[in-house]
Amino acid sequence: MGASNLLRFGAVTRISTPLLSRRSLATHAAVNPASGTYNLVEKIVQKYAVDLSPGSHVKSGDYVSIRPGTVMTHDNTGPVISKFGSIGATSIYNPDQVVFALDHDVQNKSAKNLEKYSKIESFARKHGIDFYPAGRGIGHQVLVEEGYAFPQTLAVASDSHSNMYGGVGCLGTPIVRTDAAAIWATGQTWWQIPEVVKVELKGELPKGVTGKDVIVALCGYFNKDQVLNAAIEFHGSGLSSLSVEERLAIANMTTEWGALAGLFPTDDVTLSWYEKQIRKRDKLEFQIGSSPSPSNSHPRLNMNRLDELSRTLLRPDSGAVYSKHLTLDLATLVPHVSGPNSVKVSTPLDELTSQNIAINKAYLVSCVNSRASDLKAAADVIRGKKVAPGVEFYVAAASSVVQREAEEAGDWGALMAAGAKPLPAGCGPCIGLGVGLLEDGEVGISATNRNYKGRMGSPNAQAYLASPAVVAASAIEGKICGPSDLDVSLLPPSKGLKYSISTAANAAPADASSTDASAGGVEILDSFPTAFSGPLIFAPQDNLNTDGIYPGKYTYQDDITPEKQAEVVMENYDASFASTVAGLRASSSSSSSTKQGPILIGGYNFGTGSSREQAATALKYAGIPLVLAGSFGDIFQRNAINNGLICLESHQLVQDLTRLYLENEGGVRNSKAILLDESKVHIDSSTGSINLSFKGPDGAKIERTYTAKPAGIGRSVQEIYTAGGLEKWVKQRI
């Protein structure tokens, strides 16, 4: 078949270029029978980790090189193509690994947007990449429907809702655009395995309570960053009563909860769902006469693959390590609504119903709640009724496959007959694009996943989140309320929710970290510093965001020099910071083995906020070689490592400095930078050992020793650092 020919699987356009030499599918590191116990996240990462030392096994906290089974990009594919070209790459390492799905701005029919989409399709055609055009559906839904996101595999995407894949037992996590370009070119990128939180769901949901209510409640009741930058594993007796569609909704919104992944186990519910999907696809293919053999015609969704999966199910080991243990009794849950304008505010539906909150717009769209079962739930509420006067009700299916199924079931027609306004399958209002956005002073209720101020329109509007049934009921009543057939007498008391949180009995200490090497530490590359050393600057500020580190007014000055970035670093946080660091840098001199320079220590969630990589490069250009913090914003940390800035955590060091310097402020970290008097910190790259000496506030000399997390800088980070950043690392490998 020539390069111009197209192979079609349902609605997918498969662009085939057999003349392009394809490398084999991603190779996995063999799972080693190493001593110890491992959770499910660690076991899946082990399958996709590469360049491990013989006999090693990955653990939470480790930096590893991963070769994911799938990498998906959407409308941001254009910038990734630019990065791909800038690193000198000319061919895709493994086209079978890459998927393009256009879904965000699909209502935009401008010549500029259509040209952008055309260029992305042409690139896919040239390189033999699976391409799903605008209208096929939201990329995350497509990855599940087409079997790219498959149980016990690893899939990544340049989008924060990659967590959704966990609903089918696939470990999904977001990456940034530079990572995507690196995977295109080399098949791999790096990842720090997060801490893993065990979330135990007990009991069974009462009638009228949904998976959306579960995650809205989790976000609202555990709203103190308990799962920030963690991977979540769902456990418990309650899982058997949750459908795959409900699991997908829950996993999807673990992103808003603050997690980097939300993983359900592969169980009988999962296997039965996949068998049903395969049979359904077979029936369709027989109808159109394109299936040469039943159940094995699809390259990813077929009975052979499902049978193999059922024989090789992974389970966490008894005694596996989790940082926290959260429990939620599903039987005590009632319908909940999130907001306004925050997922951290979760209110029982009956409380809001009594307030008679009028709405202007309602939305049944997005990757969290626009599957066929969601459309059915809304249609069952609205069938034979009409949307209230003055209310606009927007509906978009998660994919064209979903819409076709809803049309055949009569659910789509019921929604349209009631006065709903159809939108093409895609993100649309959820991302603030297209028609139907909230205007000043309006109130909206949505089945989407985010209600941040201004996300769905005007920042002067109010947005609530709820289940599809509640959204539909609100649309026909013109106010926030539940369906008329919701029997509240069968629900538990709205104030009776049972939930708990504890530190897992076998959790590692806050500063503990694993390393696969012996007690001597990780192996250090010849060209990587054996240690980092210098004076210590304490920035006692939690949630120091990227705008505080690098002001937004400079972000789009593309011609700004490294020197200028260094001059404005931390300008919005502490105007004197840059000059202080410049003075310290002038007195530093590195040796061949030790990297000298001022070491910065921040508070918790350092670098939260936007994805601007200048927040990392400005610190590096200022002469700071390494940042310590209680914890980091994940995207900041990825950008830092991708640009050769080392990031390590030390919970105890942050706590000790807080007690010493902020006692009069009640221990609240909300102050400008402090240069520790006569300070010197030495950080061993192999072991993560931190040796610190300085004069305290009272003039007394203090010497302390800590262990960073991870306890030793991983090989993947070392390689990126010595190459001069991820882009140069990729250049060396293509």
Swiss-Prot record:
Subcellular localization, as worded in the UniProt entry: Mitochondrion
Keyword Amino-acid biosynthesis included in the entry's annotation: yes
Checking CDD domains in the record gives:
Homoaconitase, Homoaconitase_Swivel
Instruction: Extract one GO molecular function annotation from the record.
Output: metal ion binding
Q: Please name the SUPFAM superfamilies in this protein's record.
A: Aconitase iron-sulfur domain (SSF53732), LeuD/IlvD-like (SSF52016)
Catalytic activity entry? (2R,3S)-homoisocitrate = cis-homoaconitate + H2O
Enumerate the UniProt keywords alphabetically: Amino-acid biosynthesis, Iron, Iron-sulfur, Lyase, Lysine biosynthesis, Metal-binding, Mitochondrion, Transit peptide
Mention one GO biological process in which this protein takes part, according to its record: lysine biosynthetic process via aminoadipic acid
**Any Gene Ontology CC annotation:** mitochondrial matrix
Where's the transit peptide in this chain?
1-25
Q: In which pathway does it act?
A: Amino-acid biosynthesis; L-lysine biosynthesis via AAA pathway; L-alpha-aminoadipate from 2-oxoglutarate: step 3/5
List, alphabetically, the PANTHER family matched: HOMOACONITASE, MITOCHONDRIAL (PTHR43822:SF2), HOMOACONITASE, MITOCHONDRIAL-RELATED (PTHR43822)
Q: What is this protein called?
A: Homoaconitase, mitochondrial
Source organism of this protein record: Mycosarcoma maydis (Corn smut fungus)
